[in-house]
Amino acid sequence: RRQRQMCIRDRSITDRGKIGGFMPTFFHGDHASTFVTGSYLRGIRDFDVQAAYELLLNNAFVEGSGKGPMGGRRFIKEYMEQGWISEDDITNPKLETVAKAAVTKTQEYAYDDYATALLAKELGDSENYEKLMKRTDSYKHLFDPSTQFMRGRLKDGTWITPFDPKRPFYEYMYREANGWQSTF
């Protein structure tokens, strides 16, 4: 019932998106894509799906400031160009180190791209469906076959070292996670 209210009566998620030009983002992804697509696929259709879809496309293709929940996806240009988000080169990162959380963002963006692609297909937008489906494999660029874990990479593509998959981080490589949690 609440899901229906957010799409129809309150229109809050789309209305909030119209204010800033992007669907609201949460944590590191823009899971409005899963919410809107899931609602549509469940038969909730009496909302302005086209407006919601256009905002989801902004999230997927337009660089946002990433400042707050109205800023769109951060690092989307880098994600689109190289297929993944690189991590900052930080010497001796600590648990609370603040960086790009690049592994987590890449994984979440790939998931959000999949959700938006499903909506594109439902709406007959085959061009964006194809583009987004290609990006759903982006997370694979951060799987290190030598360690068998999801792992951060630097801008030049080298793996971050040293690497301990048990070591958690607040926002370095992962968001409140470690290699084990991000892989399995």
Feature roles, as predicted:
Residues Q3-I8:
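Short, small-residue-biased leader/transition segments that mark boundaries at the very start
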Residues R9-I13:
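Long, hydrophobic, well-ordered secondary-structure blocks that form the structural core
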Residues T14-D15, A117, K121-F184:
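Catalytic cores of carbohydrate-active enzymes
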Residues G17, H28-S33, R45, V49, ...:
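Active-site-proximal structural scaffolding
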Residues K18-T37, R73-A101, R151-E176:
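Carbohydrate-binding/catalytic loop surfaces
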Residues S33-T37, L56-A60, T136:
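Active-site-adjacent helix/loop patches that line small-molecule binding or acyl-intermediate pockets
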Residues F35-R45, D112-D125:
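Well-ordered alpha-helical scaffold segments within catalytic/enzyme domains
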Residues Y40-T106, L119:
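Mature extracytoplasmic enzyme cores
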